[in-house]
Amino acid sequence: MTLGSCCCEIMSSESSPAALSEPDADIDVVGGGSGGGELTARSGPRAPRDVLPHGHEPPPEEAEADVAEDEEESGGCSDCEPRALAPRGAAAAAGSPGPGVQAARGATGPGPGPGPPSGGAATRSPLVKPPYSYIALITMAILQSPKKRLTLSEICEFISGRFPYYREKFPAWQNSIRHNLSLNDCFVKIPREPGNPGKGNYWTLDPESADMFDNGSFLRRRKRFKRQPLPPPHPHPHPHPELLLRGGAAAAGDPGAFLSSFAAYGAYGYGYGLALPAYGAPPPGPAPHPHPHPHAFAFAATAPCQLSVPPGRAAAPPPGPPTASVFASAASAPAPAPAPGSGPSPAGLPAFLGAELGCAKAFYPASLSPPAAGTAASLSTALLRQGLKTDAGGGAGGGGAGTGQRPSFSIDHIMGHGGGGAAPPGSGDGSPGSPFAAAAGPGGQAQVLAMLTAPALTPVAGHIRLSHPGDSLLSSGPSFASKVAGLSGCHF
């Protein structure tokens, strides 16, 4: 080892003790001063020169000689100082890299701080579902259409073109759109026209569901729309409380409480047990056809309901006063005309039988009260001449009888008062007090009039013999009154 190298090693150990603080540090100087030597750090620092590794100090003569040589060669060893300071710069560069190293590192690799995401990462992120319900989406699609109606496929096409989320998941939500169209009352189905070919029906909005969304915002819906039932065709201006109660019961869920507006009224426009007014004034129409019977027309005019009498059926006439007599109608009724081509019947038998039956039916109910005065005077004499025949006596009928005529079944003949019959005991032909006295001569009609005008409960002066010229056919038999006792007091 030369003296110069020793001197440089001593100076470097004194000037940079921190750089050589590690144990067993060794610095080799390669090359001379002019050659630009290189300093290399070894595994451990080297001990200073004054401390020998073998543990003995050099002699003082050698130490002085070394100091002198160092002073002489101080100029030549000046280039050793930068080489001695080089490890300090290298250590600093190794501890904290300079700005150039940091710039190089930033160019080669990404920094530890967060950076903006690239475009590929944004496309891989999932799409956000729109905050609208299916009802709102359907309403949007229908409102934007020109005719305000769309089919199911057109609604799905609008939603897919408007929102990318539904475009990617198209097959999944199509059934939800179909269910909302069918289950919500705010959507109305319109059948397709016959001349408009295609598949599916049209869907539109109910006119009453315009305020379904709050302030026109599709994000908030006020309430579920319910379609109201149609009102009756002719609502009553002032409904009866009974009808209101029926309507409330029907709304409460009682199906039997609700009655239609027309079924709530009877056949004559009145309620069952309630005097309800009619719905309104009847429409003006033609006047009812006048009925030939004046009483029936008056009854139809005074009826509480506006009903017309059917043409084939006449209304029953109102009951008359109790004092009216049935003979008034009999007097006003025309006499039955005989059949054409037939001669007058003997003694008017057919007409008499019909008149007798008619008078017998109407006489007894009306005979309970005394007839009105002057009623019998209006009795037609033609009826008496045609239907009544008085018998002049029991023997007179038997003398003029013919064998080929029809026998009579009158009460007098059955009682045995015909021709040849014996009179009941205690009753003579000329007895005026007997009810079975025969009407003699032309006074028989007067007795008939007297009987008709007299009260029904008073006995008549003479009995009318309604007999026939053929009474003699049965007169040969025994008398019926002779076998039965106590029949003398019977009027008929």
Swiss-Prot record:
Skewed-composition ranges (Basic and acidic residues): 47-59
Acidic residues: bias regions: 60-74
SUPFAM superfamilies in the cross-refs: Winged helix' DNA-binding domain
This protein's encoding gene: Foxd2
Biased composition annotated in UniProt, kind: Low complexity: 13-22, 83-107, 323-334
InterPro entries on file: Fork_head_dom, FOX_domain-containing, TF_fork_head_CS_1, TF_fork_head_CS_2, WH-like_DNA-bd_sf, WH_DNA-bd_sf
Name assigned to this protein: Forkhead box protein D2
Tissue expression as described in the entry: Expressed at high levels in the ventral region of newly formed somites, in sclerotomal derivatives, in lateral plate and cephalic mesoderm and in the first and second branchial arches. Other regions of mesodermal expression include the developing tongue, meninges, nose, whiskers, kidney, genital tubercule and limb joints. In the nervous system it is transcribed in restricted regions of the mid- and forebrain.
Record PTM Phosphoserine, positions in chain: S96
GO MF, one annotated term: sequence-specific double-stranded DNA binding
Localization (cell): Nucleus
Gene Ontology CC terms, in alphabetical order: nucleus
